[in-house]
């Protein structure tokens, strides 16, 4: 058994084992609650999160309204209810142990609204927001307004530099860390620039090293890089 050293994540010292967001409803309040209960970090997927009726049954979200905009509004309202419901479940399981994060795909329609309203509706129950599938420029502003840490997902140092210069430099207090998702090894939402050849994969270690150097140069040496997207361990590289 490896003795992992605790680090500070989202304002609390925890074991640095972090549940992946898993896309569409792949992680929920139950899974994330148990991660946090053991002193780690759980991550609830906000994409199609379930909510329940008065009998505890999952509500199968359907809109019977006729206009497209109205149906869209109903689906967004359901997503917000689901995120809040799952955050409450996670908190009930975890108590005050670990940390509870949520994960959202930035390019989904009205993702800003979903994140904002879930954080408001589950005030104090969610400690961090992870977000990728695009460049989430407004994530720092949204999370900071609610006193919640944020964790952008990037695939290169250049991507983070763009986010930092355009927005995050103004919201550095609640930048909890950066998630690195490798553009060749990850399962989806991969970010390659036009200068990079998709058929010539680069060593992820060098890309992570460059990202670390960039964070250090920006005065963010204490911010952790969370490795995701199929990059398994340093010993592989």
Please describe what each predicted stretch is:
Residues 223-232:
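Glycine-rich beta-strand-to-loop/alpha-helix junction loops that act as flexible
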Residues 234-237:
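Short, intrinsically disordered, charge-balanced linker/junction segments flanking boundaries
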Residues 1-221:
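Active-site entrance/lid segments in N-terminal catalytic domains of soluble metabolic enzymes
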